[in-house]
UniProtKB/Swiss-Prot annotation:
GO terms for cellular component: mitochondrion. It comes from Dictyostelium discoideum. This is Probable glycerol kinase. GO terms for biological process: glycerol catabolic process; glycerol metabolic process; glycerol-3-phosphate biosynthetic process; triglyceride metabolic process. The keyword Lipid biosynthesis does not apply. GO terms for molecular function: ATP binding; glycerol kinase activity. Pathway: Polyol metabolism; glycerol degradation via glycerol kinase pathway; sn-glycerol 3-phosphate from glycerol: step 1/1. Keywords: ATP-binding, Glycerol metabolism, Kinase, Nucleotide-binding, Transferase. Signal peptide: none annotated.
């Protein structure tokens, strides 16, 4: 049903372009896989030109089908939105629009030495100025009395940007590029260097170099934006030793930034299938999923079950600083005159990757479906637990010394119990992150909305509902990330209002009694304790 909204979903492993109708239903889509480059251990890169080519190819394929099937005219497409892999960082020459280096992907760990450097820099400033952590949940004890807790060096910038010092975020990647790439330094010296996350790179090129922008959600993942002012912060930039003048202009997540004007000359521009269409929505991928799930009320949350889990919890207009190591981020901002909505974010490192581990490493099954079937064939795990701390434990424990364990094994244990324990471990970790979010925010969760590849597993969602003691709801379409970007663009152009009916595809309600739930959580805590102190992190 006309009109239509398009959405570019530029992710870590692929690029997609999806066309939605006025009802929010998918009309057409195309996907292209991306090449990841690993020039050194721990390094992950993308070719910026390949990303652009994949976007254009997806658009061309969809638009060809659009016209061949008489869906409408170009004028029936009112806008496009963009959602993207967050934190991935690219720099380019503003005169040539050519990348000065491959994009450094969010999961790249090359900046770990910089993390140590900035931690030491922060520690000196903390010690010199005796800075206290006002958000700490623990205190030091001196002479039998509780005292104030000194700020940890990794949290030195957290009050302003909501993030700890980590190789994950864009600011350190930009610092690395300046330290290690002569082409970047030369372009900066000429006044020709621009930096951006992937959304900035796409908007710059789609508008023919007219718009150097990012939105508040992507900017909030750089460590360079002040959460209160929604602007680049000079103190943050100075601390991380990056030039503020090369950063994109920060805009809301829903407004017309520019129009598609792509091509080397006017003739090529006119021939682009989306020429003249407004670019009107930009959101980082996890925030886009929140919007796509219609999580607009304070206290609503979503979990994306993929390789790991990404959980976001809407805290409304409040900037909530976690006492459990969760991240504080911008959830969305619909229009430059609207107040921003904030969120707490937490992650589960091993979810779908735990299932892959059972298949690829342990040979327990040949497919994800077989894992689900095995898990369904038993009523419980037979008292065993799997703690997938392959690289330590994330929120709320933050223990680098932890490693994966299976505990509670007996002669009765078989591969069905192991399969079920892996699914349960994802749900137990999700419970702990959501529990921390509720404690930090002071709000009670009413239901959990879910998406991602693992959300197809109904047993997983039932277990999750049982452990949370809350309904778990999934939408009809699991393409919530793409729809979130389209929705932001649709709001900016008047296609949709700021609320839309959430289309339920499945609802799972608790079936586990409270005593069994309490016992299971108690045993999980015991299993967690067995995973600790495996690695000496001090040496």
């Amino acid at each position: 049903m006309k009109p239509y909204i398009g959405a570019i979903d530029q992710g870590t492993s692929s690029t997609r372009f999806i066309l939605f109708d006025k009802n929010g239903d998918i009309v057409l889509s195309h996907q292209i896989l991306l090449t990841q480059h690993h020039p050194h251990p721990g390094w992950v890169e993308h070719d910026g030109n390949e990303i652009l080519e994949s976007v254009n190819k997806c658009i061309q394929v969809v638009m060809k089908q659009y016209y061949e099937n008489n869906f409408g005219t170009k004028e029936d497409i009112k806008a496009i939105g963009i959602t993207n892999q967050r934190e991935t960082t690219i720099v380019w020459d503003k005169k040539t629009s050519k990348p000065l280096n491959n994009a450094i992907v969010w999961c790249d760990t090359r900046t770990k030495d910089l993390v140590n450097y900035f931690n030491n820099k922060a520690k000196k400033l903390i010690d010199d100025n005796n800075i206290i952590d006002n958000n700490s949940k623990s205190t030091t004890v001196v002479d039998g009395a509780q005292g104030e807790c000194k700020l940890e060096s990794k949290n030195y910038l957290r009050e302003k940007c909501g993030l700890p010092l980590s190789s994950y975020f864009s600011g350190l990647k930009l610092k690395w590029l300046f330290d290690n790439c002569e082409s970047v330094r030369e372009a900066y010296g000429r006044g020709d260097c621009l930096m951006g996350t992937i959304d900035s790179w796409l908007v710059w090129n789609l508008t023919g170099g007219k718009c150097h922008i990012t939105d508040v959600t992507n900017a909030s993942r750089t460590m360079l934006m002040n959460l209160k002012t929604l602007s680049w912060d000079k103190e943050l930039c100075d601390f991380l030793e990056v030039p503020i003048e090369i950063l994109p202009n920060i805009h809301s997540s829903s407004e017309i930034y520019g129009h598609v004007t792509m091509g080397d000359d006017e003739q090529q521009q006119q021939q682009h299938p989306l020429h003249g269409i407004p670019i009107a929505g930009v959101l980082g991928d996890q925030q886009a999923a929140m919007v796509g799930q219609m999580c607009f009320e304070k206290g609503q949350a979503k979990n994306t079950y993929g390789t790991g889990c990404f959980l976001l919890y809407n805290t409304g207009n409040d900037i909530v600083h976690s006492r459990n190591g969760l991240l504080t981020t911008v959830c969305y901002q619909f229009g430059k005159d609207s107040p921003p909505i904030y969120a707490l974010e937490g992650g589960v490192a091993v979810a779908g990757s735990g299932v892959r581990w059972l298949i690829d490493n342990m040979g327990i099954a040949e497919s994800s479906q077989e894992i689900e079937d095995l898990a369904k064939s038993v009523q419980d795990t037979g008292g065993m637990y799997f703690v997938p701390a392959f690289s330590g434990l994330f929120a709320p424990y933050w223990r680098d010394d932890a490693r994966g364990v299976m505990v509670g094994l007996t002669h009765h244990t078989n591969r069905c119990h192991i399969a079920r324990s892996v699914l349960e471990s994802t749900c137990l970790q999700t419970f702990e992150v959501l529990d921390a979010m509720q404690k930090d925010s002071g709000n009670k969760l009413v239901e959990l909305r879910v998406d991602g590849g693992m959300a197809k597993n109904n047993l997983l969602l039932q277990i999750q509902s049982d452990l949370l003691g809350l309904p778990v709801v999934k939408p009809i379409s699991l393409e919530t990330t793409c729809f979130g970007a389209a929705f932001a663009a649709g709001i900016a152009t008047g296609v949709w209002k700021e609320t839309m009916q959430f289309k339920i595809g499945g609802k799972f309600t608790p079936q586990l009694d409270e005593n069994h739930k309490t016992q299971k959580l108690k045993e999980w805590k015991k299993a967690i304790s067995k995973s600790l102190d495996w690695i000496d992190t001090k040496n």
